């Protein structure tokens, strides 16, 4: 009965926190560039490519589309839209009859001034994919899967509602990142274990690993002379009125934030293993329990570091292909600042994984054996009475 109450209270806390985070304004909802505009869905009725110029793979000019507005105050109206082509495969898109597009309507009162084709509408597919993921997770993992969904949503909301506005507001990215990571680490592990010493043990180990990653990351970012502008889209912030942002510190914070998930995973694995050992052998010493945790950590570290490597390098396959196609020498590749930044990300994140194993084994051994011994002494006192 007590365990059920604890588990239900964990879910209630998670739901309340989600509602609170959703209610928090970012402060950037009413951006000036979106005033007098409306972003809605529109169905493409026909297209006109007469002014589109093609040169190999590149297209430039304007594609004109006949549209039916599907949302907003102009719903049901037919109008013309313009799709501007800049000659960039990355940002350009072409529409076909029957496509559902996201468009930006500039208007004055009830009069449409212009309609710009923003992109293909994908939100419905994104929601479908997310719903499939949630259903599959809950189906296979039950209540644990539901708590995982809670932690996922809370993480997304915390980053979007708190961390990003704080960074834009000029808050020190490293200290803010540490606090946000600490909050998410404790909360996510709490959703796994609930009110238990295992939460304290796993959280302590993971946070010590995050702190170590932060220190090493800051030192070597400076030694590597990496500027934060290596992050995608970061330089555009400087030209959008945020000249005072410290992009390098934001890059530093991204190193330990990115690795914190893997560290939490390893900390939970080790804590669960140590707890299982103590359950089977209640009289075990904390040193033996910690040693067992280290054995589990050694087995997991090999795959976890490779996981980080694959996660970070996956987005740079095209860059590596370009280097190979050009016959770039390996020393030039490794010295290239974008590659150096990824090497820094991967190795420093792996440092965190290597350190989180002994930290968690130690905290789990001390905290969980202490709990078991207290329970044993209480049972002896009850039996004696």
Language model segments and positions:
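Hydrophobic secretory-pathway targeting helix
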Residues: 1-37
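Alpha-helical transmembrane segments and their helix-start/interface "positive-inside/aromatic belt" motifs
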Residues: 4-12, 197-210, 301-307
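Structural detector for short beta-strands of small beta-barrel domains
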Residues: 36-61, 101
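Extended, hydrophilic extramembrane loops/domains of integral membrane proteins
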Residues: 87-125
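Transmembrane alpha-helical segments that form the functional core of multipass membrane systems
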Residues: 131-138, 143-238, 245-258
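Pore-lining and gate-forming transmembrane alpha-helices of multi-pass membrane transport proteins
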Residues: 205-210, 240-257, 303, 307, ...
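Helical hairpin unit composed of two closely spaced alpha helices linked by a short loop
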Residues: 260-320, 327
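Hydrophobic alpha-helical transmembrane segments of membrane transport and translocation systems
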Residues: 295, 299-302, 311-385
């Amino acid at each position: 009965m007590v365990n059920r109450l604890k588990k239900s209270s964990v879910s209630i806390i998670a739901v309340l926190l989600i509602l609170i985070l959703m209610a928090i304004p970012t402060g950037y909802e009413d951006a000036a560039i979106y005033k007098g505009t409306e972003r809605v869905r529109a169905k493409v009725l026909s297209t006109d490519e007469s002014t589109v110029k093609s040169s190999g793979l590149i297209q430039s000019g304007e594609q004109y589309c006949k549209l039916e507005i599907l949302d907003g105050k102009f719903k049901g109206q037919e109008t013309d839209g313009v799709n501007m082509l800049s000659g960039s495969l990355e940002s350009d898109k072409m529409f076909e009859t029957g496509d559902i597009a996201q468009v930006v309507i500039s208007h004055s009162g009830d009069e449409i001034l212009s309609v710009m084709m923003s992109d293909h509408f994908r939100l419905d597919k994104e929601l479908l994919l997310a719903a499939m993921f949630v259903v599959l997770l809950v189906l296979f993992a039950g209540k644990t899967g539901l708590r995982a969904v809670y932690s996922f949503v809370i993480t997304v909301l915390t980053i979007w509602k708190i961390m990003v506005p704080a960074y834009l507001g000029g808050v020190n990215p490293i200290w803010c990142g540490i606090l946000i990571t600490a909050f998410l680490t404790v909360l996510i592990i709490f959703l796994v274990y609930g009110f238990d010493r295992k939460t304290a043990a796993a959280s302590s180990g993971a946070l010590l690993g995050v702190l170590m990653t932060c220190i090493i990351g800051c030192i070597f970012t400076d030694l590597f002379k990496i500027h934060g502008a290596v992050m995608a889209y970061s330089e555009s912030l400087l030209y959008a009125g945020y000249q005072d942002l410290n992009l390098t510190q934001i890059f530093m914070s991204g190193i330990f934030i990115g690795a914190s998930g893997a560290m939490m995973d390893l900390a939970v694995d080790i804590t669960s293993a140590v707890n299982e050992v103590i359950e089977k052998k209640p009289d075990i010493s904390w040193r033996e329990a910690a040693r067992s945790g280290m054995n589990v950590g050694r087995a997991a570290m090999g795959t976890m570091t490779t996981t980080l490597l694959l996660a970070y390098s996956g987005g740079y396959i095209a860059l590596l292909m370009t280097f190979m196609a050009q016959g770039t020498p390996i020393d030039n590749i490794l010295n290239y600042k974008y590659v150096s930044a990824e090497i820094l990300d991967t190795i420093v994140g792996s440092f965190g994984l290597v350190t989180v194993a002994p930290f968690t084994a130690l905290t789990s051994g001390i905290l969980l054996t202490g709990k078991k011994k207290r329970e044993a002494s209480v049972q002896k006192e009850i039996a004696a009475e």
